[in-house]
C-alpha cells in the first residue's frame, strides 16, 4: 500500500481532542490516513487502567494498521504519548518515522523522576497556582492517585527505550512548558539511536503544543517532516 498511516497518541489525562487540530491538518495531506484513539482509563476517570494497558492499546492499533496493509506507519506522541510512541517505534519495523512533542521522559521541575505520588500531586497543585491554572494541570488533579502512580511508573521503566528507536525522528518542545522540562527532549536527542534527528525548541509555546498560538506553524513543520526524506541532524530554537 502506497498510503501512509499516521497514528497519534495523546498524553496522560488527555484525549484525542488535544490533537484535533493536528489530526484535521494531516487529513488534508495527500496519501495520509490519520488514526487516533483514546487510551484505556481516559474515557472514564473511574477506570483503573494500568501502564501495561496503555502500551498494549498502542500495540493493538499498530498491529491493526499492519493487518490492514500499511507498510509505512508514522507515530506521533504527545507527553506520555511520546513515551508510548517510542516504545512501539522500538518494536515494529513498520514504523518509519517518529514525532515526539514534549515527550514525558521527565516530568515537572522536580529535578528527579523519583518523586512519589504525593509529591507529584503537590507539585501539580503548586504549578496550577504558579502558572495560572492551565487546563492540563487541572486535568492531572482529576485523575485517580493510582493513575498518577502508573504514569510515574511508565516514565521510570522506559528511560532506555529511546536508545532502541532508529527511525528518523522529529522532537518538538515548547520553551514555556511547565509540565515536561526541556531536559526531557534533550535526553531524547542525546540518546536516540536515529541517525536522522531534528530537535526544535519552540519559543512562546507551553505544554499544550497543538493548541498553542503557533499551532499552524507546528503542524506545517510536522507535515514537512513526514512528507520528505530527511538525513540530517538539526538542533534549533525557533
Please provide the spans of the model-predicted regions.
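Short alpha-helix in the alpha/beta-hydrolase fold that links the catalytic acid
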Residues: 21-22, 167, 181-190
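Gly/Ala-rich beta-loop-alpha elbow adjacent to hydrolase catalytic centers
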Residues: 77-81, 85
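The serine-hydrolase catalytic nucleophile loop
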Residues: 12-24
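Catalytic active-site module of serine/aspartate enzymes centered on a nucleophile-bearing elbow/loop
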Residues: 204-238
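Catalytic histidine neighborhood in serine/cysteine hydrolases
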Residues: 190-208
Amino acid at each position: 500500500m502506497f498510503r501512509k498511516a499516521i497514528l497519534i497518541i495523546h498524553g496522560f489525562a488527555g484525549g484525542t481532542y488535544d490533537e484535533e487540530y493536528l489530526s484535521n491538518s494531516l487529513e488534508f495531506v495527500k496519501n495520509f490516513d490519520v488514526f487516533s484513539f483514546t487510551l484505556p482509563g481516559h474515557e472514564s476517570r473511574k477506570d483503573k487502567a494500568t501502564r501495561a494497558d496503555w502500551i498494549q492499546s498502542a500495540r493493538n492499533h499498530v498491529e491493526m494498521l499492519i493487518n490492514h496493509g500499511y507498510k509505512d506507519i508514522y507515530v506521533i506522541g504527545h507527553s506520555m504519548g511520546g513515551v508510548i510512541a517510542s516504545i512501539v517505534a522500538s518494536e515494529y519495523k513498520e514504523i518509519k518515522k517518529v514525532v515526539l512533542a514534549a515527550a514525558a521522559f521527565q516530568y515537572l521541575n522536580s529535578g528527579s523522576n523519583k518523586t512519589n505520588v504525593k509529591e507529584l500531586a503537590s507539585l501539580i497543585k503548586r504549578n496550577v497556582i504558579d502558572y495560572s491554572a492551565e487546563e492540563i494541570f487541572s486535568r492531572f488533579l482529576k485523575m485517580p492517585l493510582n493513575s498518577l502512580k502508573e504514569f510515574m511508573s511508565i516514565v521510570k521503566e522506559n528511560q532506555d527505550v529511546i536508545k532502541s528507536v532508529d527511525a528518523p525522528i522529529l522532537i518538538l518542545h515548547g520553551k514555556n512548558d511547565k509540565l515536561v522540562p526541556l531536559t526531557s527532549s534533550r535526553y531524547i536527542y542525546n540518546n536516540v539511536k536515529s541517525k536522522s534527528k531534528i530537535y526544535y525548541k519552540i519559543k512562546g509555546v507551553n505544554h499544550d503544543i497543538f493548541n498553542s498560538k503557533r499551532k499552524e506553524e507546528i503542524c506545517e513543520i510536522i507535515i514537512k517532516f513526514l512528507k520528505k526524506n530527511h538525513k540530517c541532524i538539526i538542533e534549533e530554537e525557533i
